[in-house]
Amino acid sequence: MNNAFKDALKAGRPQIGLWLGLCSSYSAELLAGAGFDWLLIDGEHAPNNVPTVLTQLQAIAPYPSQPVVRPSWNDPVQIKQLLDVGAQTLLVPMVQNAEEARLAVRATRYPPAGIRGVGSALARASRWNRVPDYIHQANDAMCVLVQIETREALKNLPQILDVDGVDGVFIGPADLSADMGHGGNPQHPEVQAAIEDAIQQIRQAGKAPGILMANEQLAKRYLELGALFVAVGVDTTLLARGAEALAARFTHNATTTTDNNKSVY
């Protein structure tokens, strides 16, 4: 077993991603052929559940793009189900401290290293027990990315980085800017300073920094600073803005939209 996304991060190869929020296997497959290194299937802010995640994993599987799945919460039960349907790389939201980071890691590991329940006869992940010795190989194939999104998490970042099994740390600029008192303005200088400092700390600890940023100039800046997994857009935004722009060229019904150059998404 291997995890190409995890291998790329370990090798220090920057990975460019796209956020998926349409909850559609059809659009997921369409975007899997677009050339992104990874695609984030969002279960926190998009109305995904285990069955919809499963169909998107199946749709992406034939393509080079690697799936990353975000559960709605740092919940071992939900994580167990996502792993069983085939997720190998998880982006765990709102991790505040080392204890919560350890919980996320343990949820992805079979005992004695963790608390993942054994049900491989029922699991797509093991090809229904057709993967030889799956239970002894699976732990090493897991990639755990934790999200830091508050001032408390930033304060605890050194301890989070010390947690064995955390492969990367994703900085959530939207929630972080809100927590810092600059909601809706992730480009505020205080927020940007915090993000840049966090990227440097994460790299110095030998982990992979990640972020989502639709502003092209900022996304490139984060890559220059050493971010290794950077999502540069969102499927819902691409569809909405593209449709609005097309309508505006032919009708008088142009919709007022958010300036994406000032937004995370």
From Swiss-Prot:
It is an enzyme of class 4 (lyase). It holds the Pfam family HpcH_HpaI. InterPro entries: Aldolase/citrate-lyase_domain, HKHD_aldolase_ent, HpaI, HpcH-HpaI_aldolase, Pyrv/PenolPyrv_kinase-like_dom, Pyrv_kinase-like_dom_sf. The active site is at H45 (proton acceptor). A divalent metal cation binds at E149, D175. Pathway: Aromatic compound metabolism; 4-hydroxyphenylacetate degradation; pyruvate and succinate semialdehyde from 4-hydroxyphenylacetate: step 7/7. Binds 1 divalent metal cation per subunit. SUPFAM superfamilies: Phosphoenolpyruvate/pyruvate domain (SSF51621). Keywords: Aromatic hydrocarbons catabolism, Lyase, Metal-binding. GO terms for molecular function: 4-hydroxy-2-ketopimelate aldolase activity; metal ion binding. Substrate binds at Q147, A174, D175. GO terms for biological process: 4-hydroxyphenylacetate catabolic process; phenylacetate catabolic process. It catalyses: 4-hydroxy-2-oxoheptanedioate = succinate semialdehyde + pyruvate. Its EC number is 4.1.2.52. Its cofactor is a divalent metal cation. The keyword Lyase applies. The record marks R70 as: Transition state stabilizer. GO terms for cellular component: cytoplasm. Homohexamer; trimer of dimers. Catalyzes the reversible retro-aldol cleavage of 4-hydroxy-2-ketoheptane-1,7-dioate (HKHD) to pyruvate and succinic semialdehyde. Belongs to the HpcH/HpaI aldolase family. This is 4-hydroxy-2-oxo-heptane-1,7-dioate aldolase.
